[in-house]
From Swiss-Prot:
Top-level lineage group: Eukaryota
Protein name: Sonic hedgehog protein
Keyword rRNA processing in annotation: no
Phylogenetic classification of the source organism: Eukaryota, Metazoa, Chordata, Craniata, Vertebrata
Gene: shh
Family: Belongs to the hedgehog family.
One GO CC term on file: extracellular space
């Protein structure tokens, strides 16, 4: 506690690779499904909106902007209610997020995935 971790070489994730290496809706990855959150539910009030055009992470050494100057994190899907995901999707609870980079350069996605894991997502 209180000690900085030594920087380590970041290895990009492969396409369709998960950390932990289990499907997103398993207990090991995300805990139990707690139920879909709708706009009319009490739990909807617990969701925190973020209208900031820049997403900032508390991460002294490996942010998207440090890794790729001028590139921003682009959130394509967060909490959702449209019914386009599987029935117990974590998007319906506000516990899943789909991300890309502002330049939409797919060659960055493996490293972006690794940065998300290192940031605690």
């Amino acid at each position: 506690y209180g000690r900085r971790r030594h920087p380590k070489k970041l290895t990009p994730l492969a396409y369709k690779q998960f950390i932990p290496n289990v499907a997103e809706k398993t207990l090991g990855a995300s805990g139990r499904y707690e139920g879909k959150i709708t706009r009319n539910s009490e739990r909807f009030k617990e969701l925190t909106p973020n209208y900031n055009p820049d997403i900032i992470f508390k991460d002294e050494e490996n942010t998207v902007m440090n890794h790729w100057p001028g590139v921003k994190l682009r959130v394509t899907e967060g909490w959702d209610e449209d019914g386009h995901h599987f029935e117990e999707s974590l998007h319906y609870e506000g516990r899943a997020v789909d991300i890309t980079t502002s330049d939409r350069d797919k060659s960055k996605y493996g490293t972006l995935s690794r940065l998300a894991v290192e940031a605690g997502f």
